[in-house]
Amino acid sequence: MNNKPVVGISGCLTGAAVRFDGGHKRMDFVMNSLAPWVDYKPICPEVAIGLPVPRPALRLIQTTCGDIRMRYSHAPHDDVTERMNAFADRFLPTIGELAGFIVCAKSPSCGMERVRLYDEKGNRGRKAGTGLFTAAMMDKYPWLPIEEDGRLHDPVLRENFIARIFALYELNALRAQGLSRHSLLAFHSRYKLQLLAHHQAGYREIGPFVARLHEWDDLDAFFVRYREKLMAILRHPASRKNHTNVLMHIQGYFHRALNSRQRAELREVILGYRAGRLPILAPLTLLKHYLAEHPDDYLRSQNYFEPYPDTLGLRLAIT
């Protein structure tokens, strides 16, 4: 098991000059801020199937039968769909250790959503496609965190994606070390507040599932189901309302330890966040201060307080 999360990435986003026009789309956050904390596995599917750099632009063509094909824009009958599908079939089984994948938006091979579709006559259609390589990856690994470069400029989506990367990495490490009922229960306990912040209905559904762990003889089968449920919950970005519920829940742990002035101050800070007057870091910082003064083993174990390295500063941009 790697000592850092391994993240797949479209090669052009690393600065490699592999785009159809011979250029790249190097992303500063990815290559500067995030790079010290992950190991990248870059791939350009179009180069991987033997296409040159530079090369004519490719398009997704929706046929009259509804099939999606990948063809050259200047030669609509020159089809590379089978080559791309064959590459995906060979390559995707080798990336099971990945904790996430960052793909290039709008690409006919890598785009995650809203890729332009064309008809067979070359007329522009809806932005409703998914790149062939990414579509195959999403089908094979539905739990894998996948995000586009453009969407990572959104602070909420960026924070959510990075949190999912580190969650899946920790879960995969648990499996690599050898599964036990104790380790699975301890993992879930650590993630309770994080899950509650992301999706309350999912949190309520996964709890009884974990409570029935003793009924499972095959722990790996349980792991597969649990991974699916966990990552589906975390896919929902944490909302202000859910964050507020979690913060108030944590506040209750300090009811007896704090004096009336401290309790009132903490409540005002949480309500200030709920009203949008304060950033999420305001109540979190105060709660961490009280946790240092009044240690609680359960709270100290919670992933919610540090779902990824604090030095990434992802919550600084979340209001």
Residue map of PLM features:
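Short beta-strand segments
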Residues: S10-G11, C44, I102-K106
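Short catalytic helix/loop segments, enriched in acidic residues and glycine
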Residues: G23-K41
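Short, surface-exposed acidic-centric catalytic microdomains
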Residues: P45-D67
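Divalent-metal-activated hydrolytic enzyme cores
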Residues: D67-F87, E97, N123-R190
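N-terminal glycine-rich phosphate/adenylate-binding segment common to multiple enzyme folds
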Residues: F87-D119
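Acidic, Ser/Pro/Thr-rich low-complexity regulatory regions
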Residues: I146-T319
